[in-house]
Amino acid sequence: MGQKINPLGFRVGVTQQHYSYWFAQPKNYSKFLEEDEKVRTCIEKYVQKQIKNSSNYGGIARIEIEGKTDLLQIEIYTGFPDSLVEENGLGIDKLRTNIENLLKKKSQKIQITLKNVLQPYGEPRILAEHIALQLENRVAFRRTVKKAIELAKKTDIKGIKIQIAGRLNGNEIARVEWVREGRVPLQTIRAHINYCYYPAQTIYGVLGIKIWVFRDEE
């Protein structure tokens, strides 16, 4: 059988950049890695809480973290940054305070920047969150996938593949279903492929959502 490699890791240094920029001594690497993961989890939980009741749902496309000795720069790429900014910027201040309490590093300042994604539904992470929300509300998966592809086709992408695995529509036997529109050349390293895996917690169990988005070739 063919072995499936992560499309993002496969293209790092060619068309894909790292989402984390920091350096650590070998003995401290695991500690830095754990802190990086905690910061990402903290941001995702906070954002989900903030936009849970928002009509302008955009979700997070990606989080980029750059760590220095005295500064931690965090860039959050989201579909609708306005839903995260409260009056006088209190939303960002609250998030910064949460991260400071989590890391407990008084010598390191935290700088958070929100960046707007012009085409939210061209981002696999935002699409996956949208699909997961529909599946958790017991919408039929074929209808959900069809709607997601319609949203994606309104952007400038050249191809998309969506795969859902698990007890689809509550069936006793788990299975894998996938749909592809356009080209998705996974073997071409110079192809700009965005990829996301996202779990959906349904009453029948966990459904695994995988999305590949093809934008362009170098």
From Swiss-Prot:
GO CC list: chloroplast; cytosolic small ribosomal subunit
Coiled coil: none
SUPFAM superfamilies: Prokaryotic type KH domain (KH-domain type II), Ribosomal protein S3 C-terminal domain
GO function terms (MF aspect): rRNA binding; structural constituent of ribosome
Keyword Nuclease attributed: no
Residues covered by the KH type-2 domain: 47-118
The keyword Chloroplast is assigned to this record: yes
Listed PROSITE patterns: KH_TYPE_2, RIBOSOMAL_S3
One Pfam family matching this protein: Ribosomal_S3_C
Localization (cell): Plastid, Chloroplast
Keyword entries, A-Z: Chloroplast, Plastid, Ribonucleoprotein, Ribosomal protein, RNA-binding, rRNA-binding
Record InterPro entries: KH_dom-like_a/b, KH_dom_type_2, KH_sf_prok-type, Ribosomal_S3_C_sf, Ribosomal_uS3_bac-typ, Ribosomal_uS3_C, Ribosomal_uS3_CS
CDD domains given in the database record: KH-II_30S_S3
Biological processes per GO annotation: translation
Family: Belongs to the universal ribosomal protein uS3 family.
Binding partners and assembly: Part of the 30S ribosomal subunit.
Protein name: Small ribosomal subunit protein uS3c
Native species: Angiopteris evecta (Mule's foot fern)
